[in-house]
Amino acid sequence: MRILIPILVLIAAIDLYINYGRVNSSVAEAEQSAALVQIEIPSELSGLATIGKRGFDKNCAACHGENAVGKDGVAPPLVHKIYEPSHHGDESFQRAVAMGVRAHHWKFGNMPAIEGLTRAEVKAITAYVRELQRHNGIN
């Protein structure tokens, strides 16, 4: 029993080291990737979209890029015709956050569910993305 505890501690330490490194390298790669589209930023946002921008920056930008322009090799731009409201309605954003998304338009891989966001927070984030889209001719 005395030898079992140090072995378990060693295994846990190795696991932590391996997984911590993976998470940090994924975040670092996401931060360094180039934008996939160039967009114009609206000079003003509605109140809901302003709240949504804060939520997007905190929860989405690491993968989808600042102002939803995507990141090469990481995640697609959300300011893109594929995500226009007639093809991906607002509820699709809710479902993506709640359940994740199987890759179907892009070759970035699957998107995991995002924990900790309420429907109201996702609604605000969606409002932000929609205002960016409209400002860039995506209706």
Can you annotate each of these PLM segments?
Residues 26-55:
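Electrostatic cytochrome c docking/interface patches
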Residues 72-79, 99-132, 137-139:
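Axial heme c-ligation environment in periplasmic c-type cytochrome domains
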Residues 3, 33-39, 76-79:
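Short glycine/proline- and charge-enriched loop/turn segments
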Residues 2-18:
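Hydrophobic membrane-insertion alpha-helices, especially the h-region
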Residues 48, 89, 93, 121-122:
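Stable alpha-helical elements in mature extracytoplasmic
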